[in-house]
Amino acid sequence: MCGTRVHASVRHCLIGRDARLRDNPPGAGARASFSEYRMPRKRNPSKRKQPVRSVTQEELPLLDLRAADLPPAPPPDTSRPADASVRSTRTIEFLLRALPPGWRDKTRDLLVLVRMDRPIGALLLLWPTWWALWLAADGFPPWKYLIVFTVGVFVMRAAGCAMNDFADRKLDPLVQRTAGRPLAAGRVRPHEAVLTFVVLALIGFALVLAFTNRLTIYLSFAGAALAALYPFSKRYTQLPQVVLGAAFGWGIPMAFAAITNGLPPVCWLLFLGNVLFSTIYDTEYAMVDREDDLRAGAKSTAILFGEADLPILGILMATLLFTLLLVGQRAQLDWPFLVGLGVALLLFAWQLWNMRWRQRDACFAAFRNNNWVGGVVWLGMVVALAMK
């Protein structure tokens, strides 16, 4: 019976083929294909192949995760920091090539300790300081203050990095991105990091003491205290990024004090804007290390915000732009400043879109993109002040 059924099926296929050949002879372009001789096959609808999109662990939002929920971390690379700039590293190697090997290695490690291999942090600190200098001077600031505050930004940022690595010397080896830092990898000793901080802080204080007024000198003590406080804040509060914003933004009241010998309301409005700006980009930075921070027990706004990180970042970005809009209104800045804010809005939108899957590389790219945000705001401010 089974053979009869198979024979009938084959006969049915051949009869159907002959009928099609009569209606469409080969001369008319009809050609029998191999598929016409195959037996009909019934498909099971439940076994149809469905398109499946592979989602990696990095694409999943880290929502309310505990350290026990995370997979084991891969072994870190301690040869150099994972986020070091290749171009800056090559520049350092080129400048140190004439030194003896022992001196060259130690000097390179000290330069990496103070982040000379990664200047993006200094630029993010520089832009708000320049905002304040141009606003306080109502145009191009005096060269003396421009040089003092620009050099001071790099010096105090380097001092803060040395103190940060000293404070995190037990946490950094547990974080993949920071395990290659000189202090975490054992290439620099803790007392050398503290000595580096003291020397750089004294250089910064000497600049303020020699070239500014008494009010600026008083404010510099508060700035040094904030710079030393930030590295330890991540152990006791979920908002270390806010502390960083206050420390990074302290150059704003110092710039107003140096140029105007006062602290007008627009100064504190701009300071608030910088706290928001620093919280935005350092939260994006912390999103890169969120899993490692959970394992190490460190605190950050990225962990605090959880699955609401992107909506909260969007709110902070909108609040920052509104704050800068108020600054422009008080300073009577014209349309070029508004254009700068418009470009900053587009850059913020790109950051949120790029981070939608919360991948490490995307979050780090968004963090670096804030250098352009600070630059376009400053450029709009400069042009608007020049047109007054």
Stretches found by the model and what they are:
Residues 40-112:
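Transit-peptide-like, low-complexity N-terminal presequences
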Residues 124-131, 244-257, 304, 368-381:
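Small-residue-rich segments of transmembrane alpha-helices in multi-pass membrane proteins
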Residues 125-126, 148-153, 169-220, 295-335, ...:
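Multi-pass membrane catalytic core of lipid/isoprenoid biosynthesis enzymes
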Residues 129-130, 134-167, 177, 201-206, ...:
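Membrane-embedded alpha-helical segments that form the functional core of polytopic membrane enzymes
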